[in-house]
């Protein structure tokens, strides 16, 4: 599974419960990836609200909750992620400093290895798309005897 998250320069994802930014060119980029893989992208109703009617509904699954069995999940809110099911992470870097009160953080035991970096020129500025391969480590806590 691939998780997609948009972040600002400080790892911020939300401010006052709302997305920091949105971009038409990035949405097209995402839908093109999913279409090329003959797949679908899962997202919350909140995330789906930024997609227009003509933006290929057949490629999207709108869900309140995720099973993490989906091929792609576009997340805009900090939710618990089953990292052991994640193979790839796509970070859309806004390359801007925005106000934020929720941040994207990797938990201990999750390692991301950068595979590819792309630049997308949007209507207002250039976005950096970073694709990572995700590895999880099993951490075992030994009980005191």
Predicted feature locations:
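Enzymes that bind and transform nitrogen-containing heteroaromatic metabolites
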Residues: 1-145
């Amino acid at each position: 599974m691939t998780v997609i998250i948009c972040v600002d320069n400080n790892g911020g994802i939300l401010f006052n419960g709302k997305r920091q930014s949105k971009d038409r060119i990035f949405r097209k980029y995402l839908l093109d990836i999913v279409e090329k893989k003959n797949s679908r992208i899962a997202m919350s109703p909140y995330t789906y609200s930024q997609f227009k009617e003509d933006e290929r509904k057949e490629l999207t699954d709108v869900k309140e909750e995720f099973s993490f069995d989906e091929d792609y999940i576009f997340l805009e809110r900090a939710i618990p992620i089953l990292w052991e099911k994640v193979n790839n992470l796509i970070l859309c870097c806004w390359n801007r400093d925005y106000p934020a009160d929720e941040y994207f953080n990797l938990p201990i035991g999750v390692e991301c290895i950068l595979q590819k970096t792309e630049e997308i020129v949007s209507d207002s500025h250039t976005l950096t798309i970073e694709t990572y391969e995700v590895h999880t480590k099993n951490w075992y806590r030994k009980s005191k005897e």
